[in-house]
Curated annotation (Swiss-Prot):
Family: Belongs to the FGGY kinase family.
Keyword annotations of the record: ATP-binding, Glycerol metabolism, Kinase, Nucleotide-binding, Transferase
Protein name from the UniProt record: Glycerol kinase
Gene Ontology CC terms: cytosol
Regulation: Inhibited by fructose 1,6-bisphosphate (FBP).
Organism listed in the record: Francisella tularensis subsp. holarctica (strain LVS)
Residues annotated to bind ADP: T13, R17, T268, G311, G412, N416
Length: 502
């Protein structure tokens, strides 16, 4: 039977998805299922790892069945996943010892504060992992599980526990425990991986008291990791051939193969990445240095700005405040007025990411008067997304010395034309929206396809990607500068709030 398709596994923060692509990049079928968000305490976020696997395996079967594709027609599987979220499980039984601790979870802030008391070690972490010390990353989450789950430390020291980011957890289950591996992009998000030596960093592991025996093997992003167990997908042994964290996969899906090319993904969070080539560039502006992907043992590096709350702010004005009935309504209300009338909303619900890295910042709405209406709050929420992206991209310009030559965008929020136009205005730059919005999944599929010869080279991949719409700046630079100064003032009001008022 001919191998005409590649299956993308897209395991996100709020849902598990499976998408079948053909050789022209067309989507044959999408299946999606949401799963439970667990909030045990304020600032804590967890997922049930077994529910993640259950929903993911379910949507894979659903996509195949309703897409009328037989497992034997799948040339390869590409995996892309929410990053930093980590699972610790029993090596023998495959059972998690605790819920997955999600990237948004702030429970390890105190561990990070302890690390920050040693400036030399903080410097070591930045120079060798490319990351800042923050509760966002996987390393301190693993330490918390080992320190707080009864019996976990003893089992880990005895070599009976394994850990992994979500890609590793999925690979383990797809292969029924035969493969315990991750790729360079996901490894680079743990705060445990040395992006210079391309090895797990023993000094950091020792500091956090994490046994190296728990850690997965690190492989190329485009490489056959193993095959699905014969009991997983209708008896077929399908190569798992592409793996990348969601933002890295999106950069690859946008075909940002050359140094200086950048993309921004608008999802639960907002993530801008710029390809900086085959050598890491370290930021003076609060950006992260990360491995974008690796092929044939050679990494491509990127600068990244991470914004924690983007799509979630629209969910909040819908579900928390009841200002809109649907996310789509936000565009309608935002365009009913000419401006926010000086209102700014800073959605620092779980702190601020790049370039501020303030774990204790909290959300604020400033500039309210008796004239403030629902429309002003809604528009301010949308504008906050664009302002945060500008914060990040301005830092990239400073660190690389490169002007932004257009920005490639993807994610759910790119369907909001008001937001995309405002983003173009505030950046004073062209915004390109591709016809295929499933760019993250496409990137995973591209990586898998290259590994198994489904596509011959990157030039062929570029021919698949086409542009749907280009947004050009319509606002003058003086007005933009004025509005951006207001945003910066609003951010200052949100900083250190939880620290001051806890």
């Amino acid at each position: 039977m001919s191998k005409d398709f590649i299956l993308a596994i897209d395991q996100g923060t709020t849902s598990s998805r499976a998408i079948i692509f053909d050789k022209k990049g067309n989507i044959r079928k999408i299946a999606q299922k949401e799963f439970t968000q667990i909030y045990p305490k304020s600032g804590w976020v967890e997922h049930d790892a077994m529910e993640i696997w259950g929903t993911q395996s379910g949507v894979m079967r659903e996509a195949l069945e309703f897409g009328r594709v037989k497992p034997d027609q799948i040339a390869a599987i590409g995996i892309t996943n929410q990053r930093e979220t980590v699972v610790v499980w029993d090596k023998e039984t495959g059972d998690p010892v605790y819920n997955a601790i999600v990237w948004q979870c702030r429970r390890t802030s105190s561990i990070c504060d302890e690390i920050k008391r040693d400036p030399q070690f903080v410097k070591y972490i930045k120079e060798n992992t490319g990351l800042v010390v923050d509760a966002y990353f996987s390393g301190t989450k693993v330490k918390w599980i080992l320190d707080n789950v009864e019996g976990a430390r003893e089992k880990a020291n005895a070599g009976k526990l394994l850990m992994g980011t979500i890609d590793t957890w999925l690979i383990w289950n797809l292969t029924r425990g035969k493969v315990h591996a991750t790729d360079y992009s996901n490894a680079s998000r743990t705060m445990l991986f040395n992006i210079n030596s391309l090895e797990w960093d023993k000094k950091i592991l020792d500091y956090l008291n994490i046994p190296e025996s728990m850690l997965p093997e690190v492989k190329n992003s485009s490489e056959v990791f193993g095959v699905t167990d014969s009991h997983t997908l209708g008896g077929a042994e399908i190569p798992i051939a592409g793996v990348a964290g969601d933002q890295h996969a999106a950069l690859f899906g946008h075909c940002c193969f050359e140094k200086g090319m950048a993309k921004n993904t608008y999802g639960t969070g907002c993530f801008a990445l710029m390809n900086v080539g085959d050598k890491p560039v370290y930021s003076d502006e609060g950006l992260l240095t990360t491995i974008a992907w690796a092929e044939n043992g050679k990494p491509t590096y990127a600068l990244e700005g991470s914004i924690f709350i983007v799509g979630a702010v629209i969910q909040w004005i819908r579900d928390g405040l009841g200002l809109v009935r649907s996310a789509e309504d936000s565009e309608y209300y935002a365009t009913k007025i000419d401006s926010t009338n000086g209102v700014y909303l800073v959605p620092a619900f779980v702190g601020l990411g790049t370039p501020y890295w303030d774990m204790y910042a909290r959300g604020t709405i400033v500039g309210i008067t008796r004239d403030t209406k629902r429309e002003h709050i809604i528009r301010a929420a949308l504008e906050a997304i664009a302002y945060q992206a500008k914060d990040v991209l301005e830092c990239m310009k400073e660190d690389t010395g490169l002007d932004l030559a257009g920005l490639r965008v993807d994610g759910g929020a790119v369907q909001n034309n008001f937001l995309m136009q405002f983003q173009s205005d505030i950046l004073q730059s062209e915004i390109s929206k591709p016809k295929i919005n499933e760019i993250t999944s496409l990137g995973a599929v591209f990586l898998a396809g290259l590994a198994v010869g489904f596509w011959k080279d990157k030039q062929e991949l570029k021919s698949i990607l086409t542009t749907e719409k280009v947004f050009e700046p319509q606002k003058d630079s003086q007005a933009v500068a004025h509005d951006y100064r207001g945003w910066k003032k609003a951010v200052e009001r949100s900083k250190a709030w939880a620290e001051c008022y806890s």
